[in-house]
């Protein structure tokens, strides 16, 4: 018998012994109460996650495609659960077939996890349709009643039921500092881990993670509101990174943070940006907290009745700080990696999954791309000549669709880039309208701003195609060989209503 055949037989025997120790893929006693997840899905691999009830060995089994639930696994791994990892366990499974649906389960003794499902990405040459959904901004903090203070994460349930190839949970996946009055701030690793467990105690999030592959990313509230290391330090950053990576099967690199890209067939490549690891301090101090420092004087005067401070001129030092080329949002290494990758992409559509709005919104710009004007220009310059780019963003707690412009107001009128952005969410936190109400101390102000500024065409407003600032939900995306369609959807799966009262029409981008 050849050495190769001997090795194959020994490997087969070893897998059989592991499989035999857990039996076929039947269920054991219910366990792993926080569910399962599959992240970083590629054509041939995925990173599978669970949280056990105790330290010690855990067996992960992967079922063959189209097999019954009692079939023997095609992969079986033994992984040791450590208390130092908060009992979370992750394993990269390789050697899978592209474009194939797999199921998986974790075991610890006679206790089994729920069954999870994911579909591997198709080959880069596969001319297939791809469907996915995106949302973010989910606070599970309890209110005075002891129940979640905002809602029960119904948006996640709608996404889980949509039958997507994968989903995206991007930004503010916990709230270390909830907007609910009196909530304690989670600063340590242990406190942040408790926030992740709090979210996973809600069934809709567990359903989302088990239903399909899930790409995850952070924004500020995984650390603290409007976070930058320059302002808040490395200690809370390190705690946020550790807790996030314990609970989200994602890939982090010190040089580029959570930036990475994934190809899904001939027609789609996704680029996930990290907007927190390398950004400079905000320009808020130089601007004295001005509510709209970059808005033209005519726009400021038009809204001075709502916010009297807008009648005052903007200090030049404020504008200089916002436009300073020394300040960055992405950092040089991440920007270079992103620029190289998106310019080299052969996918029909390039989707940039983006932590804060790239479009100009003017109100409170400090934490957005507008507050880092030089880096915004660098990104837009990098995207010049790249065809079929669409930006998907969370963070704003609103549903907005608009073109990314280099200039919205001015003597020559709007100057567009041809790049469209869809902002989606939130899942569970104060909506943008309610935040405007609170900031101005005037209930109903958010709806006024949405209708009077976001919808009218320039120079009277931003001219957004869809503007809804007071509805929970997500963005549903369908990619075909010729079109990319984004439909804003509510927490129940319905179409988001525009502030005008009509349904928000989908964004349809046709391949060029």
For each predicted feature, which ranges?
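Metal-dependent phosphoester/phosphodiester hydrolase catalytic core
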Residues: 26-512
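Sec/Tat signal peptide C-region and signal peptidase I cleavage site
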Residues: 21-24
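Bacterial N-terminal signal peptides
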Residues: 8-18
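Bacterial N-terminal signal peptides that target proteins for export
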Residues: 1-8
């Amino acid at each position: 018998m050849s050495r190769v055949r001997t090795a194959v037989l020994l490997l087969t025997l070893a897998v059989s012994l592991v499989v035999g120790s857990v039996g076929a893929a039947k269920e054991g006693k219910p366990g792993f109460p926080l569910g399962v997840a599959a992240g970083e899905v590629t054509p041939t691999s995925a990173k599978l996650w669970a949280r056990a009830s105790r330290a010690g060995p855990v067996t992960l089994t992967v079922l063959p495609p189209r097999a019954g639930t009692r079939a023997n696994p095609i992969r079986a791994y033994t992984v040791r659960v450590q208390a130092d990892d908060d009992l979370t366990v992750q394993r990269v499974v390789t050697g899978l077939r592209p474009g194939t649906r797999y199921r998986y389960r974790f075991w610890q003794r006679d206790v089994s996890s729920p069954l999870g499902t994911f579909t591997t990405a198709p080959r880069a040459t596969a001319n297939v349709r791809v469907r996915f959904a995106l949302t973010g901004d989910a606070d599970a903090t309890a209110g005075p009643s002891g129940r979640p203070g905002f809602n029960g994460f119904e948006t996640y349930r709608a996404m889980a039921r949509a039958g997507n190839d994968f989903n995206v949970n991007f930004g503010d996946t916990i709230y270390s500092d909830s907007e609910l009055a009196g909530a304690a701030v989670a600063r340590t690793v242990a406190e942040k881990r408790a926030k992740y467990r709090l979210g996973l105690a809600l069934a809709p999030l567990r359903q989302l993670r088990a239903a399909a592959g899930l790409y995850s990313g952070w924004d500020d509230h995984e650390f603290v509101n409007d976070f930058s290391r320059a302002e808040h330090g490395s200690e809370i950053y390190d705690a946020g990174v550790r807790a996030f990576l314990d609970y989200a099967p994602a890939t982090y690199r010190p040089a580029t943070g959570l930036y990475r890209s994934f190809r899904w067939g001939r027609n789609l490549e996704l680029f996930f940006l990290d907007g927190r690891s390398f950004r400079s301090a905000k320009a808020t101090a130089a601007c004295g907290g001005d509510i709209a420092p970059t808005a033209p004087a005519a726009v400021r005067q038009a809204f001075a009745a709502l916010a009297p401070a807008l009648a005052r001129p903007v200090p030049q030092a404020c504008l200089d700080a916002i436009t300073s080329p020394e300040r960055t949002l992405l950092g040089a290494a991440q920007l270079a990696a992103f620029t190289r990758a998106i310019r080299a992409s052969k996918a029909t559509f390039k989707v940039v999954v983006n932590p804060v709005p790239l479009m100009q919104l003017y109100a409170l710009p400090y934490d957005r791309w507008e507050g880092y004007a030089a880096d915004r220009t660098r990104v837009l310059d990098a995207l010049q000549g790249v065809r079929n780019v669409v930006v998907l963003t969370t963070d704003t707690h609103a549903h907005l669709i608009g073109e990314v412009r280099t200039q919205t107001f001015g003597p020559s009128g709007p100057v567009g880039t041809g790049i469209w952005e869809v902002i989606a969410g939130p899942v569970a936190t104060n909506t943008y309208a309610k935040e405007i109400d609170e900031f101005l101390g005037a209930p109903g102000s958010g709806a006024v701003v949405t209708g009077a500024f976001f919808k009218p065409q320039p120079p009277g407003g931003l001219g957004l195609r869809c503007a809804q600032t007071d509805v929970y939900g997500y963005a549903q995306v369908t990619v075909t060989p010729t079109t990319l369609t984004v439909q804003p959807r509510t927490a129940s799966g319905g179409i988001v209503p525009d502030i005008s009262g009509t349904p928000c029409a989908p964004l349809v981008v046709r391949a060029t």
